[in-house]
């Protein structure tokens, strides 16, 4: 009886493996990296590196439609430089009180200027257009934003800062566009650890 159960369990896993192998072939969305995904009204929205301000939409995280342009960078610090829509990296997005908020990082090291910032834009529609309420520099020397909403409703942003390597910081937010208090360092590379074997990460 025990042998019979083991055979049945093995067959079940084998069937599942075959099913997934047939239905999902990676990559499911070629050419997209360092992406953020938001679920809204039963659909998934993704944006990130190489999407150039576009979102892709899916019902199942496997089959994705054609790109939809949702944001064009328009601010004083990037205008006139090489930091265009192709520099929209590492998206994060969420909906709060009917407003959609989109964050991304710019990591541009061009001959004309260096621009390493986190940018925020918002829209009333999940597919934009997203507009930057602050056209000035929003946050210097930080990348890869992630906003977390706690159970009490408090918002926090987590991000990477270039400080002797990539250090992880957190900061409380007044609202999706403003901070409250000072940033707090949460993680940094320790000497002689794996994070420092090549370059500090």
PLM features: what roles do these ranges have?
Residues 20-201:
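Carbohydrate-active catalytic/glycan-binding domains of CAZyme proteins
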Residues 1-22:
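Bacterial Sec-dependent N-terminal signal peptides
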